[in-house]
From Swiss-Prot:
Gene3D superfamilies: TATA-Binding Protein (3.30.310.10). It comes from Methanothermococcus thermolithotrophicus. Keywords: DNA-binding, Repeat, Transcription, Transcription regulation. This is TATA-box-binding protein. The lineage of its organism: Archaea, Methanobacteriati, Methanobacteriota, Methanomada group, Methanococci. InterPro entries: TBP (IPR000814), TBP_archaea (IPR033711), TBP_CS (IPR030491), TBP_dom_sf (IPR012295).
């Protein structure tokens, strides 16, 4: 049975304009914080969808915490509308690029991390971190595997890559099982 994959974080970026007046934007946006001595961007938190948006003077905007690219796009559209309504020169429909997705899943088994740690591309130091770090080259992702069978997959650009990564891991575990047992 295929493990259920849950996307827990999507980070996207876009360009909403140039030379954004962050002081003015902080005044007009609800839930916005701008403290340039601590961070060079404006931080705006939305509750629906629940995301954080980082807006920089250059016009670059990052959205983090979304559960899907669509949620991130909805959040970006909300911010763009507020900024445009306040008279700011903002790009209407900017191209939104996924920078990273994080997914979780349960393998449904309790893998032997010591056995897996013999594979190329793995790091396992249980005294420092309870999970095994497995770097795959295709898809180019990092998978954290825990003794409970839970996995965290980072570096995704699309959800399909999470399924590819899990398929590779499950077939590798099957091969290891045949080799060791």
């Amino acid at each position: 049975m295929e493990p259920e994959i849950k996307i827990v974080n999507v980070v996207v970026s876009t360009q909403i304009g140039t030379d954004i007046d962050l002081e003015y934007a902080a005044d007009i946006l609800d839930n916005a914080e701008y403290e340039p001595e601590q961070f060079p961007g404006l931080v705006c938190r939305l509750s629906d969808p629940k995301v954080a948006l980082l807006i920089f003077r250059s016009g670059k905007l990052n959205c983090t915490g979304a559960k899907s690219k669509e949620d991130a796009e909805i959040a970006i559209k909300k911010i763009i509308k507020e900024l445009k309504d306040a008279g700011m020169d903002i790009i209407d429909n900017p191209e939104v690029n996924v920078q990273n997705m994080v997914a979780t899943a349960d393998l449904g088994i309790e893998p032997n991390l010591d056995d897996i740690s013999t594979l190329e591309g793995t790091e396992y130091e249980p005294e420092q971190f309870p999970g095994l770090v497995y770097r795959l080259s295709d898809p180019k992702v990092v998978v954290l595997i825990f003794g409970s069978g839970k996995v965290v997959i980072t570096g995704l650009k699309k959800k399909d890559d999470a399924y590819l990564a899990l398929d590779k891991i499950l077939s590798t575990l099957k091969e290891l099982e045949e080799e060791y047992y």
